[in-house]
Swiss-Prot record:
It is found in: Nucleus. GO terms for biological process: positive regulation of transcription by RNA polymerase II. Its main location: nucleus. Residues 64-75 have a biased composition (Polar residues). Residues 19-45 bind DNA. Residues 56-78 are annotated as: Disordered. Gene3D superfamilies: Zn(2)-C6 fungal-type DNA-binding domain. It comes from the Eukaryota. One of its GO terms (molecular function) is DNA-binding transcription factor activity, RNA polymerase II-specific. The keyword Nucleus applies. SUPFAM superfamilies: Zn2/Cys6 DNA-binding domain (SSF57701). This is Uncharacterized transcriptional regulatory protein C3H8.08c.
Length: 563
């Protein structure tokens, strides 16, 4: 018994009538300009015919036209495909970029354009919004936390716009107005801010009365946000700006400032979303402040990872890496000048990192004078624009810029400790510059440790101090004279690290050994530190790199040994 041949797949015989957004959502479109659904969601409404006209290409772009600039195209024989003139329903990267580059009317430029599909309504219903709202403190407490956030965490990396956040904050008192976007704006801010070590008493009293610690509350908030954001990924819903902001804030406020080991996974995720899902890197200042500043904040965090933690940059090797801010990003001259100087420091620091790992010794020495000149000019501007002990907000910016400055200068010279004596013609001067930079960095951070702790930068400051002390100890072996009071600083750092870091797998013992080794190198004639643990046979420099999860070329850059 013969079976009937399978039915041929029916091809679309007419051009799609719905707009691109409605077709992607698989909902009915009323074909207006814009359609009612796009107008309601304040999204760009574009039809296939409009996109084709703008691109000035054939009736429908084919796969080959969009995937490659090659003139060679695949031809299908008529007997295989009898409908060779049928138009395929395909929209390639050119069409997507047309949507990205679409500009709104001038009266809409101040609002943040949305390039992503909103979450399914099943995740935006009242039940989900209510479950998120229940995690928020009362309005008065939330307001104090938000104000603290903009005075501390948002100063260095401006991820959020204060006016937008305040609008979401005001919706707390109006449940009918509180939305999914409001929740995903406020909750990451609150979760990050309540992790600060020096919270005001009114905030601490609220959490004590609620029977929960701020850290536990932060953990619960992050778990809920993860649950909902992962549901969106499962349903192939592209995250909107609130998801990108959440990832950036975690990358900066948690992984960067409060973790010793491991890759900054949230930074990796935010880069992925910002490049492959919602391509912020293609957006310029011409579209609007509130879109471009997210990419700028991401580039700053990437630069800080490279300079302060000496990790390879993800973005700065790319042509889209940007560290120069635009004036329209900021509401005041102080913030703009701060990020202008920070961008210059990070740009110089990243360039130093690249040179250390790509040039030979002789070529790198030829660039020392140029880097020194750049850093000196930046230091003059820092002293002129931000030294103001009477204003704590301005003074914190001053201290932070000086911390980045001295770290960049340490990074400029630290590679030379890996070379044997006699290789450098001016070894005494170079080692002296490194040792002096280390001492200046340590003195700055120790003297300003209180304000750094208040602003959430205690762990980063302690790590920079340990690194500088380690390098100063190596400089002493090469003839540099170190001050006599560094032993007390080493003991203080060890006590503070034990207080704020939870060690596991014997890391506390190994960490203490590294600090005792540093102290013994700085002051070889003094007795060992009290409560010393048994000595280990491990190489202290390798042990240091392992504790802080640095790569093996942290102390011995392979490119510098290739002479």
């Amino acid at each position: 018994m013969s079976s009937s041949p399978p039915a041929l797949k029916k091809f679309r015989k007419r051009s799609p009538k719905s707009c691109l957004i409605c077709r992607r959502r698989k909902v009915k479109c009323d074909r207006q300009q814009p359609c009612s659904r796009c107008k309601e969601r304040n999204e760009v409404c574009t039809y296939a015919d409009d996109t084709i006209d703008k691109m000035n290409v054939g009736p429908h772009p084919s796969h080959s036209e969009n995937a490659s600039d090659s003139e060679t195209t695949l031809e299908v024989s008529p007997d295989i495909n009898p409908k060779k003139n049928e138009k395929f329903d395909f929209y390639g990267w050119r069409s997507l970029f047309e949507l990205i580059k679409y500009r709104k009317d001038s009266d809409m430029c101040s609002s943040r354009p949305s390039f992503s599909i909103q979450a399914y309504s099943s995740y935006k219903d009242n039940v989900v919004v209510e479950s998120l709202a229940n995690l928020l403190p009362p309005f008065c407490i939330s307001q104090k936390i938000v104000n603290l956030f903009f005075k501390t965490l948002n100063v260095v990396c401006p991820i959020y716009d204060q006016e937008t956040v305040e609008k979401s904050l005001n919706n707390i008192e109006s449940p009918e107005s509180f939305s999914y976007e409001d929740a995903f704006t406020l909750l990451p801010i609150i979760a990050a801010t309540i992790q600060l070590s020096d919270l005001p008493d009114v905030i601490l009293n609220f959490y004590n009365s609620a029977g929960i610690t701020p850290l536990e509350s932060s953990r619960l908030i992050n778990l809920k946000l993860n649950e909902i954001s992962e549901q969106e990924y499962k349903h192939l819903c592209l995250p909107d700006k609130e998801i990108i902001q959440m990832l950036l804030l975690r990358a900066y406020a948690t992984k960067f400032r409060t973790r010793i080991r491991g890759v900054n996974t949230d930074l990796c995720r935010s880069i992925h979303v910002s490049t492959l899902v919602t391509p912020l890197f293609q957006v310029t200042e011409k579209i609007g402040k509130n879109t471009s500043d997210l990419w700028f904040a991401l580039c700053e965090i990437d630069g800080l990872e490279c300079v302060l933690k000496y990790r390879p940059p993800f973005i700065q090797h790319d042509t889209y890496g940007r560290l120069k801010p635009l004036r329209c990003f900021f509401n005041d001259d102080i913030s703009y000048n701060f990020h202008l100087l920070l961008g210059r420091l990070l740009d110089c620091g990243v360039s130093i990192y690249k040179s250390v790992h790509s040039l030979t010794v002789s070529k790198f020495i030829d660039k020392l004078e140029s880097y020194e000149s750049q850093l000196s000019l930046i230091l003059v501007d820092i002293e002129a624009k931000f030294y103001d002990p009477s204003n704590e907000d301005i003074q914190f910016r001053y201290i932070f810029l000086k911390m980045v400055f001295w770290t960049a200068r340490v990074n400029l010279y630290q590679c030379f400790i890996t070379l044997d004596s006699g290789i450098l013609e001016d070894e005494e001067t170079i080692i002296g510059n490194l040792g002096e930079s280390c001492i200046q960095c340590v003195r700055l951070l120790i003297s300003q440790i209180t304000i750094l702790e208040k602003r959430g930068w205690l762990l980063v400051a302690l790590l920079e101090i340990i690194h500088a002390l380690m390098l100063a100890a190596f400089c002493r072996d090469k003839g540099f004279e170190v001050p006599s009071d560094l032993g007390d600083i080493t003991l203080y750092v060890q006590e503070r690290m034990v207080d704020i870091v939870t060690f596991d797998d014997g890391m506390a013992v190994r960490f203490g050994y590294v600090l005792r080794f540093i102290n013994s190198m700085l002051h070889p004639n003094e007795p060992p530190m009290q409560d010393a643990e048994p000595e280990t046979t491990e190489d202290p420099s390798k042990l240091f790199a392992d504790i802080f999860d640095f790569t093996s070329n942290y102390f011995i850059p392979s490119a510098l040994l290739d002479q």
